[in-house]
Amino acid sequence: MGTARIAPSLALLLCCPVLSSAYALVDADDVFTKEEQIFLLHRAQAQCDKLLKEVLHTAANIMESDKGWTPASTSGKPRKEKAPGKFYPESKENKDVPTGSRRRGRPCLPEWDNIVCWPLGAPGEVVAVPCPDYIYDFNHKGHAYRRCDRNGSWEVVPGHNRTWANYSECLKFMTNETREREVFDRLGMIYTVGYSMSLASLTVAVLILAYFRRLHCTRNYIHMHMFLSFMLRAASIFVKDAVLYSGFTLDEAERLTEEELHIIAQVPPPPAAAAVGYAGCRVAVTFFLYFLATNYYWILVEGLYLHSLIFMAFFSEKKYLWGFTIFGWGLPAVFVAVWVGVRATLANTGCWDLSSGHKKWIIQVPILASVVLNFILFINIIRVLATKLRETNAGRCDTRQQYRKLLRSTLVLVPLFGVHYTVFMALPYTEVSGTLWQIQMHYEMLFNSFQGFFVAIIYCFCNGEVQAEIRKSWSRWTLALDFKRKARSGSSSYSYGPMVSHTSVTNVGPRAGLSLPLSPRLLPATTNGHSQLPGHAKPGAPAIENETIPVTMTVPKDDGFLNGSCSGLDEEASGSARPPPLLQEEWETVM
C-alpha cells in the first residue's frame, strides 16, 4: 500500500512547537508562524471531537435499527459504482448518515488522526476527504484517502501496526514540484557561495588594514568596523542555519510517514522542558538579528561619515569616531534587547525564528529607517558629485566622459550605501508569488550575500594607498630574501667607503689573492670625497658670497591628504577649519 510522505516545511513547522497555556487569535501577519499553525490544528481537533459525538450517536441508532449503512456522495446523490483499486475524491466530509440501504455491514468509525477528521466509512469503500485548509503548506485542491475493509475496520499497512492513509495529493504541492525545489536549491547555493566569499575577502581586508600602520586612520577604522559587521552577519547566518536545522535535513523530513507526523502533532512538550531545549536556537537567532542590525547601521555610519566630510566645515574625526562606534554597535543592541524582552514575555514559543504578530516591527522599523536615511544621504552625495564634475569640466565639450565618471561614482557608492535594499523594500516577499517572487528572491540573495565581497574589493583591494603599501612591503621582503640568499651562497658586496651596494656580486676591494683584472671602464669612477661636503668649491670656481650654508634643509611636510594617504588625517588643527584636501582620498576612491 501507499505510504504518506510529509513535506519538509510541514515537518519543520510541527517539529518545534510549544503550546502556550492560553491561545491567542491568529495574527493578521504576513508570516504564518508555528504557533498559529498549532492553534489551528487544535481548534480543528476540538471541532472534530464535537462532530464525532454526534455522528457516533447517529450511527449507533442506525445499527440498532438494522438498516445497515450505505455511503452517500457529497452532493446527496447516489454514488456510482467504482472500479476496484481506484481513488475517488469527494469535495467534503460526510456529515449525515443516510437511511437508504444498498449494502449492509458495520461501518468504519470516524476518528481524528491529528491531521484530518475522518468521517464514517462504508465497508469496502475508499473514503476521500479534502486536504485540510488549516494546514498552511498543504495542497488544498487535493484529497486524502483511507480504505474501510468489509469488516468495518480501517485498513492497516501490512507488517505495521498503523492505519493506512494516502496523503500524496496533499503533499504534491511541496514534494512533487521539482521546479520549485530547484529554485530553493539554487537560492541556497547563491547565498552560501556569496556569504562564504564575502567572509573570506573581508577577513583578508581587515588583516591588511590592521597590519599596515600607515593605513591607521579614522576613515579606515570605520571601514574596518563595517567589514567586521559584514563578517559577523555572514558567520551568524551559517551558525543559525546549523543550529536550527542540525537535527533535521530535507531528505529526512520527506521520509517521515503519516504515523510519525501524528506523533509529532499529538502532545507538545512541557513549557519548562521546551525552554531548555530552545535555549541554543534562541541565542543563535538573537545574535543573528543583532549582527544583521549592526551591519545595516555601520553602512549608515559610512554614509554619515562621508556626508559629514562634505557638508561640515568643522569636523573632528577622532571625537566623531567614538560616537560612530557607539551608534553602530550600541543602538542595535538597544532595540534587539527590547525585542528579546517582549518576545520572552509575550511570545516565548519556539525558536524565535519566525515573527510573532506585530512584535517584529521592534526590529524592522529601525532597520527600515536606516535604509531610508542612507538612501537620502546617497542622493545628496550624488548631487554634490554631479556639481563637482560640472565645475571641473566647465568649458569642455566632452559631456560623455562627464556622464561616465558620474555613473562610475554612483556604482561605487551603491554597495557602500546599500542602495539595493530600497528596490523591494515596500514589497514584502510574502505578498508576491510566481515569477515576481523568484526575481525578488534571486535579487536579494545575490546582492545581500555578495555585498561584503564587493565592498572589500572596492574599498580595500582596489584602493591605491593599500596597493602602494603592499608593493612596498613586497619589495622590502624580496630584497631581504635576496640578501639572505646571497649571504648563504658566499657572495659578498663591494663597498664605496662607508656605503654598501647590494646589487654587486663582485668583490672589488684590494684583497690579496682575490683581485681580478678588470677593464678601467668597469671599475667605479674615482670620486673626490671633499666635493660632497657642504661649502666645497672646485678649484677655479667663483666664490660664494654667503659661505654659511645650513646643514639641514627645510622640506615641505606631506600633509597626508594627497594620494589617499592616511598620515595626517587624524591631526587636527586647533580652532582651524578642516583643510580642503581632506576629501582627496575619498574623491579618489569614488571618482
UniProtKB/Swiss-Prot annotation:
Bilayer-spanning residue ranges: 189-212, 220-239, 283-306, 321-342, 362-382, 410-428, 441-463
SMART domains attached to this UniProt entry: HormR
Extracellular compartment spans: 27-188, 240-282, 343-361, 429-440
Membrane-side (Cytoplasmic) residue stretches: 213-219, 307-320, 383-409, 464-591
PANTHER family, sorted: PARATHYROID HORMONE_PARATHYROID HORMONE-RELATED PEPTIDE RECEPTOR, PDF RECEPTOR-LIKE PROTEIN-RELATED
Family the UniProt entry places it in: Belongs to the G-protein coupled receptor 2 family.
Listed name of the protein: Parathyroid hormone/parathyroid hormone-related peptide receptor
